[in-house]
Amino acid sequence: MKRRKFLIFGSLFGLMPYINAKTITSFKKEFQEVGATIGSVQEHLFPSASKIPSAKSMGVTTFLFETINHKSYDRDIRAFVLEGAKELELRQKGKFTLLSKEDKERALREYEETRYGKNWLSRIMTITMEGLFSDPIYGANKNEAGWVALESYGGEPRAKSRYVEL
């Protein structure tokens, strides 16, 4: 390798942390645009009137954000989660979060009829359930309420720190 190429590559590698930081910042901005929609879908799927604690009370929207924002999470799935929420809002003319319970059910059923919508709802359901029943150290399943509702508890030994922080 010639000296000039070495210096160019060295400079590019030195900039990598800043390039990554820009991506994370843009993701946070994008998530803020659709976070309310995702939270509303999660709350509709797991409402407060069921045996299982509500998605809202368990903090699963924050769990979803932290999970898909992690650097090891698949970028395509991350984009899929955001784009799916944007598509749902587009189909509902930006008013999904304002719809009644019955209208949300109708909108989600219609969205589920599309292949894209079916896959998106499945992904949201999966991540939401991961949050509802994960070890509370990961920020959801507050007070182990998900485990209590199922009369099941996490394995032993319990995590002492978040896996993503190791």
Where are these regions (language model features)?
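C-terminal segment of N-terminal export signals and the immediately downstream linker at the start
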Residues: 17-52
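A glycine-rich, aromatic-flanked flexible loop/lid motif
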Residues: 12, 57-58
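Generic hydrophobic alpha-helical segments
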Residues: 13-14, 48, 131
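N-terminal export signals
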Residues: 3-24, 100
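Short, intrinsically disordered low-complexity segments
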Residues: 2-3, 157
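Mature-region segments of soluble proteins
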Residues: 36, 40-43, 51-53, 59-166
